C-alpha cells in the first residue's frame, strides 16, 4: 500500500489483531466492514435482537430477506464473502455484566457502537479493568461524537459523561449517511491504534455537526475521582499495576 508509515509491518499488525464490535448496525456494522477490508484478522460481533425493516436505511451488511432474523449472523456471512480470510465470532446477545469481561479479554481493543448507555458503561468499565483501548462513537440525528479511550492515559467514558444522558427506548432518528460517516472515522481510529501509523484521537472529543458540515475538537481531562478509572477505582487493586495495553495495539 502506497501510504506513508503504512507498510508491511502495519498490515501484519492488522492481521494479528482481534477487535470487539458492539452493536452491529449502521455504525458498528459499517465500521466492521472497513476493518474487514483493511485486513483485520479477527472480529467479535456482539448484538442481540433481530433485524427490523426500519433499520434498513443504514444497514450496509444486511438484505431485505433477513428482516426478522438475528443480524449478527448475516453480518458474518456478508463480511466473510468480502474477506474470506477473516475470522468472525458472533454473539447473539447484548453486552451484559455476565459476558462483558470474557468478551473484552478475548480482544485487543473494542469499538463501542452500542445503542444505549447501559451497555456502553459496562464495556467502558471492562475495558478499564483489563486495560484494553476502546473507540467510543455515538450519534443522534445529524450530530456525531468520537473519542478514543486508553485506560490509565485518557479520560474514560465515565469521566466524560458522569451523568448519563436520557435515552429514548424508541431509538433515535439518523440518516444512513450520518452513521456511515461516523463508522468510517471509527474504523480509522481502530486502524491507527492497531498499527501506530498515525496519531489517534486521544483526550479529545470530536464533535461533528453534519447539518452545517462543522467539525470541532474539545479537550478532555481525566477525573481523578472517577469511580471507574480514578485514583481510588477498584480496578487498580483487582489487576496488577504492571498490566500493559495489548501488544497488538500501539499508541504514542
UniProtKB/Swiss-Prot annotation:
CDD domains cross-referenced by the UniProt entry: ThiF_MoeB_HesA_family (cd00757)
GO cellular component, one term: cytoplasm
InterPro entries cross-referenced by the UniProt entry: ThiF/MoeB/HesA, ThiF_NAD_FAD-bd, Ubiquitin-activating_enz
Keyword Transferase set for record: no
GO molecular function: nucleotidyltransferase activity; thiosulfate-cyanide sulfurtransferase activity; ubiquitin-like modifier activating enzyme activity
Pfam family, one: ThiF
One BP term from GO: nitrogen fixation
Record keywords: Nitrogen fixation
PANTHER family, per the entry: ADENYLYLTRANSFERASE AND SULFURTRANSFERASE MOCS3 (PTHR10953:SF102), UBIQUITIN-ACTIVATING ENZYME E1 (PTHR10953)
Family: Belongs to the HesA/MoeB/ThiF family.
The protein's name in its UniProt record: Protein HesA
Lineage, uppermost ranks: Bacteria, Bacillati, Cyanobacteriota, Cyanophyceae, Nostocales
Gene expressing this chain: hesA
